[in-house]
């Protein structure tokens, strides 16, 4: 008799490469702390450079780099690729206008739309300040007028009664003094000797002598 065939199931053998990948432990390496930025982003620096230079024909790449070195003290060689990328994207988005050249090579300036927006913002701020100022001035004027009116009223009210009371007694005193000497001057006409002189002609008796001349008439008898 023949032995029955024994069926053997296939055993999966793991490949050595896969086993190694799964068994590799993750090594926790200490992460280096990121150094703090000593300058703002490249996009901001380049935009400020074009904004402050304000060249009519536009600012060239070299002029922008010189500005970044002087203003932010950065290594322009390391940031060269970032500067060029920003210039290209800014021109595509309409943030900057390329006046000369192609790509990152050429001259760049702010578009007219950006300048108009800045002018509009400035003009909007000015009327607000001007509107606030007259209100303060109006408040001050109202306060001044209110403060002045009671002062003037009190001054006029006080002056009128003071003038009346002081003037009346002053006028009454000289009137009493003038009336006092008048009765003293009344006895002066009594002492006048002039009427006595007028009686002197009555004492002239020699004028009666012609009456004695009538005596011869008696002789006729």
From Swiss-Prot:
Residues 38-112 form the H15 domain. One of its GO terms (biological process) is chromosome condensation. Gene3D superfamilies: Winged helix-like DNA-binding domain superfamily/Winged helix DNA-binding domain. Keywords: Chromosome, DNA-binding, Nucleus. Residues 1-43, 113-221 are annotated as: Disordered. The keyword Transcription does not apply. The keyword NADP does not apply. GO terms for cellular component: nucleosome; nucleus. GO terms for molecular function: double-stranded DNA binding; nucleosomal DNA binding; structural constituent of chromatin. Residues 141-167, 175-221 have a biased composition (Basic residues). It is found in: Nucleus; Chromosome. Belongs to the histone H1/H5 family. Histones H1 are necessary for the condensation of nucleosome chains into higher-order structures. PANTHER family: H15 DOMAIN-CONTAINING PROTEIN-RELATED, HISTONE H1. This is Histone H1C. It comes from Chironomus tentans (Midge).
